[in-house]
Swiss-Prot record:
The keyword Amino-acid biosynthesis applies. It comes from Bacillus anthracis. HAMAP family: Chorismate_synth. InterPro entries: Chorismate_synth, Chorismate_synth_AroC_sf, Chorismate_synthase_CS. PROSITE patterns: CHORISMATE_SYNTHASE_1, CHORISMATE_SYNTHASE_2, CHORISMATE_SYNTHASE_3. Belongs to the chorismate synthase family. This is Chorismate synthase 2. This reaction introduces a second double bond into the aromatic ring system. NCBIfam families: aroC, PRK05382.1. Reduced FMN (FMNH(2)).
């Protein structure tokens, strides 16, 4: 599978075209809208989320609630475009209109794509950069991820994300009896945290940052249960599933680090305390005593839950802006202020779920793929039976 997105933050709409989704997948707009609504929630979001109520329109590739096997096109309208029609319109402006335009950006914000993108593409108005580099684009990435999640769910695979740290406040209680319990608890938490006490402290940290005109980041974790053994590859570096997952997490706006399983903690332990001992029983076949590898070894799945974490830096748009330089006058100035969140970590956990789900669904279709969901399901069932008795 593959997809491409298009659209600007304050343009008319966001669009994604998805290719390679098998025929026969049950899919309706509500499957996607539920994920879009989850992305818009979360403590610390800005005023933009009060304007937009994201709803998807499926314009191709689905008929009567089932995928056809042809490309799926999804559209999400930007309601805020009504206030930006002149500034973000496709038609040229008159000389007078250009002079009157008050939204030209010449003061790059530290931490954003503004300056680098303007230099790369030769834009004197950095709005041309920030409109596309905005995290608003993750709306349609979540939409694509919702389709991937639906593929996984049909194959008995569950994806759940949660927040384990915000602004230095770390969740202490991260145990759960089932992945469904994990989902239930985090959906009820304003910061998507399993630890209620830590969640309250996270809310306070967000409030403190907002009152100071600042922003804070954090760490999210995605857990996936139900993946078969041996998905991915050790044969080529670019087909290793852990490499693809790491790239997917790092592709999310403002993410600066990723780890799988115990991750960087492995540097502090001897090998005897890192590697997962292999067990076998008649009911389940091969399993592991521990899951320090996070469900991935040698670029392939082990059959244990996949555990991926990502580090999100504080959002660089600040209400007490940092020092910058005006690209027209070269004079020092405080950077431009754009409407923004004070913390987007809870929402980012939903985006992380989406990109992880996409990579796993793609890997499954590559390995077991045919053009129909029922045949893919049969292939996976045969593979699981084979692996149990191997």
């Amino acid at each position: 599978m593959r997809y491409i997105t298009a659209g600007e933050s304050h343009g008319p709409q966001l669009t994604t075209i998805i290719e390679g989704v098998p025929a026969g997948l049950p899919l309706v707009a509500d499957d996607i809208n539920e994920e879009l609504a989850r992305r818009q929630k979360g403590y610390g979001r800005g005023r933009r989320m009060q304007i937009e109520t994201d709803q998807v329109q499926i314009v191709s590739g689905v008929r009567h609630g089932e995928t056809l096997g042809s490309p799926i096109a999804l559209v999400v309208e930007n309601r805020d475009f009504a206030h930006w029609t002149k500034i973000m319109g496709a038609e040229p402006l008159t000389e007078q209109e250009e002079k009157e335009m008050k939204r030209k950006v010449t003061k790059p914000r530290p931490g954003h794509a503004d300056l680098n993108g303007a230099i790369k593409y030769g834009h004197r108005d950095m709005r041309n950069v920030l409109e596309r580099s905005s995290a608003r684009e993750t709306t349609v990435r979540v939409a694509a991820g919702a389709v991937a999640k639906k593929v996984l769910a049909e194959l008995g695979i569950t994806v759940a994300g949660h927040v384990i740290e915000i602004g230095g406040v770390e969740a202490k209680e991260t145990t759960y009896r089932s992945i469904e319990e994990l989902k239930s608890i985090t959906e009820a938490s304003p910061v998507r945290c399993l630890d209620e006490e830590a969640g309250n402290q996270m809310i306070k940290a967000i409030d403190d940052a907002k009152s100071n005109g600042d922003s804070i980041g954090g760490i999210v974790e995605v857990i996936v249960e139900g993946m078969p053994i041996g998905v991915g590859s050790y044969v080529h570096y670019d087909r290793k599933l852990d490499a693809k997952l790491a790239a997917a997490i790092m592709s999310i706006n403002a993410f600066k680090g990723v780890e799988i399983g115990i991750g960087f903690e492995a540097a502090h332990r001897p090998g005897s305390e890192v590697h997962d001992e292999i067990l076998w029983n008649e009911e389940h076949g091969y399993t592991r005593r521990t899951n320090n590898a996070g469900g991935l070894e040698g670029g392939m799945t082990t059959g244990m839950p996949i555990v991926v974490r990502g580090v999100m830096k504080p959002i660089p748009t600040l209400y007490k802006p940092l020092q910058s330089v005006d690209i027209d006058t070269k004079e020092p100035f405080t950077a431009s202020i754009e409407r923004s969140d004070s913390c987007a970590v809870p929402a980012a956990s939903v985006v992380a779920e989406a990109v992880v789900a996409w990579e796993l669904a793609t890997a499954l279709i590559e390995q077991f793929g045919l053009d129909r969901m029922d045949l893919i399901r049969e292939n996976i069932e045969k593979h699981n039976e084979y692996a149990r008795g191997f």
